[in-house]
Amino acid sequence: MIKIAVLGYGTVGSGVVEVIEKNHDSINKKAADDIEIKYVLDLRDFPGDPVEKVLVHDYNVILNDPEVSIVVETMGGLHPAYEFTKQALEAGKNVCTSNKELVAEYGTELVRIAEKKDINYLFEASCGGGIPIIRPLNSSLTADEIDEIDGILNGTTNYILTKMAVDGLDFDEALKEAQQNGYAERNPEADIEGYDACRKIAILSSLAYGAHVDYRDIYTEGITKITATDIKYAQSLGASIKLLATSKKVHDGFYAMVSPVMINAHNPLYSVQGVFNAIFIHGNVLGDAMFYGSGAGKLPTASAVVADVVDCAKHLHKHIIMNWSSRPLKLMDIENVRNRFFVRMEGCMAQEIVRVNSVFGDVESFSVPGITGEFAFITEKMPEHEFREGITQLKGIRSTIRVGF
């Protein structure tokens, strides 16, 4: 029998308990052993909940119990999750987590400890919720050199942008609805400013490229400046606006960024709606592949965590090699990355386009019926720094968004 402990009985932790209880027989068959939850750690009490039978408030009870071989960390945040995880690994216990903040910050260190102890630190649920992506990167795609990852990695922002596009809501209205429906936190900053997606693309890039990508080095821009008018312009082009997390190999370098991007129907991420996530990967042998599914939520995330528990159970005394070196990967300066740009500008298109062309060369200019006093244009591909320099020469700029077609 394999005994596990769950740290945290919140949304994901309670989901882990539920999944193990609900699918107990099939999980045990796949693990080739019986998996039993011996402890659940939480500061709170849960009167009337069956979890009370295994509930403890002192982490040392778990740490000092030699029967516990797998620890499931679903506490979230950096502290004390980091200290508890490190102590568990150093004590020879496998750890599975859904905590992207912890993995992005301390992943290299924790993977190294697990390697030295010949145990495992697994984090499938940290990047795509219920979407299997870490395991494919680490095993199924090992024959490939990955040269591009593009993802919709945050369900909250995708839900907001979908509501703006489908229902014509402005940003604040869509955010409020997301909060009312439980898709956004009371403090949504990590989601809407792109920080959550940034940590996830850092983890995926580290595994894909075999070196450590520091999330602090990734250019990150959220969706708070996207307006209902921006959405209307995109729709007039047969396009949609998505918060994309991207990392890409360019010649001998790599870049990574998170930002709103206008994409059209030729992009496989175009049709990803609501709280769903999707991750597009290009390999030099495989070509294109896309992973799609529920990117968040209690049971989808718990499903990925329990899959890691089963993996740990099958490799109790053997470390699963992770292609994640502690060697830092130096990213390209984002100012040298080339993109096309959508620009909304005040004024009459017929009068202003000569000035625009004098700055950016020939552009694709257009207007949308019903929107007055402004027009829009799309530039050719150019380095980010050239665009920033050019845009300062024009007055009345209302919006700028990168274009992926």
Which ranges hold each PLM region?
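Substrate-binding/catalytic subdomain of NAD(P)-dependent oxidoreductase enzymes
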Residues: 175-271, 276-278
